[in-house]
Every structure is written in structure tokens, then in C-alpha cells.
């Protein structure tokens, strides 16, 4: 009985691992792997695992030899559910397309625009991001490329007055595109996600990271 309850506590972490591996291997999309398996089914299993762990702890009070199994079950269950609760607070409703200049936002290079169309991303207009402002300086394209790399992006192309890049997440491969537009006296940044998943203020965070590297 106790071993079965331990297995119940391990279901959510196991499903999370399967969701990540399946997405990385291309067995299913990030929307399904993260949105359905990890965030929806995994959350249900996390609560089920915690219930199983608590039952195992009650059994351990009667049979001391079950203390080890109960402790392991509670550790996994509490850690997994805690992770989900933290993610719920992070994954708030936030813009997935942000820019430092909303009146005249930078546009993505043709290669990025083509990739976004092939990925089925619909056209969107950047929205405001609290605290995101342009860099009040004209930087060299090499400096902009360096800033993108420091912020975790892969540089895809550079030109005298622009740099473009892409960043893929380590777990589910969620992709964010970035473009840096360079003009006299200011440098603007735009970051937009490709996936339909709501991952909180990730686009805003990445854009701020790029601007921080551009600002002396």
C-alpha cells in the first residue's frame, strides 16, 4: 500500500519529464506538452500525489517501518506541488509582444518574419511593458549583437542599423524573437513570443535584459 502511494506521488514528476522529452523529440507540440500535459494534467496529478503522500504519512504513524517511504513520498509531492504553485504566480496574463517604441515599433527581419509565418504566428502589435524604455544611445551593431548574446539570444543577422535574434527555452523550446533597431540617439528593442502559451512576463523580462546590456 505504501509503495503504491509513493508511486502516486511520483506520477506528476514522471509526467513532467515525459512532457519535456516528448516536446524536445518532436513527438508533440509545445502547446500540448506544456499546456496540456505539464500544466493541466500534471497539476491534477500533483494534488493527487500530495493526497497519497499524506495518507502514507498516516500509515507511517501506525507502522514505523513505513517512515522512509512516507518521507520520500511527501518530499516529492510537496516539492512538485510547490513548483506548480510558484509557476501559477509567474504565469500571469501579460503581453507576449512588447517594444520600447509603441508608436513606431521595430519590425522583424524578413527571415524572422518568414519563420513566424511558418510557425502560424498571427500578426500582432506590441504592447506596453512596465519599465521598458529605449536605450538613449546609438550603439554599433556589434554592440547590439553582444547584448543579445548576453541576454541569451542567438544572433541570426546583423546590419548597420539593426540586429535580429531568437531564443529557445531549455525545457519546452518556447521561442522568443527579438529585433534591435538602431537610430541616432536611441536604440529600440522588440521581443515577441511565437507560442500560444501564456508564460507570464517573459517577453518583457527578455526585452528589459537586452536594454540593460545596451545601456552604458
Each language-model region and where it sits:
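Membrane-anchoring/interfacial helices and their immediately flanking loops
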Residues: 1-27
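Interfacial segments of alpha-helical transmembrane regions
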Residues: 2-10, 61-77
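Hydrophobic alpha-helical transmembrane segments of multipass integral membrane proteins
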Residues: 14-17, 47-57, 74-78
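Ser/Thr-rich, low-complexity intrinsically disordered terminal regions
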Residues: 23-35, 39-46, 55-69, 79-216
Amino acid at each position: 500500500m505504501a509503495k503504491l502511494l509513493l508511486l502516486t506521488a511520483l506520477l506528476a514528476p514522471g509526467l513532467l519529464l515525459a512532457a519535456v522529452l516528448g516536446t524536445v523529440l518532436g513527438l508533440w507540440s509545445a502547446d500540448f506538452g506544456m499546456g496540456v500535459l505539464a500544466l493541466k494534467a500534471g497539476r491534477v496529478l500533483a494534488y493527487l500525489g500530495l493526497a497519497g503522500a499524506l495518507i502514507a504519512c498516516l500509515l507511517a504513524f501506525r507502522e514505523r517501518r513505513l517512515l522512509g517511504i512516507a518521507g520520500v513520498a511527501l518530499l516529492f509531492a510537496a516539492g512538485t506541488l510547490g513548483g506548480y504553485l510558484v509557476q501559477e504566480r509567474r504565469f500571469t496574463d501579460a503581453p507576449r509582444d512588447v517594444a520600447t517604441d509603441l508608436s513606431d515599433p521595430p519590425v522583424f527581419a524578413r527571415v524572422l518574419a518568414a519563420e513566424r509565418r511558418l510557425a502560424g504566428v498571427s500578426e500582432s502589435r506590441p504592447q506596453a511593458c512596465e519599465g521598458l524604455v529605449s536605450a538613449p544611445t546609438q550603439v554599433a551593431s556589434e554592440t547590439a549583437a553582444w547584448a543579445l548574446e548576453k541576454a541569451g539570444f542567438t544572433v541570426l543577422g546583423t546590419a548597420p542599423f539593426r540586429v535580429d535574434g531568437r531564443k529557445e527555452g531549455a525545457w519546452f523550446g518556447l521561442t522568443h524573437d527579438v529585433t534591435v533597431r538602431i537610430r541616432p540617439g536611441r536604440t529600440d528593442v522588440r521581443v515577441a513570443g511565437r507560442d500560444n502559451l501564456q508564460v507570464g512576463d517573459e517577453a518583457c523580462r527578455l526585452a528589459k535584459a537586452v536594454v540593460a546590456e545596451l545601456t552604458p
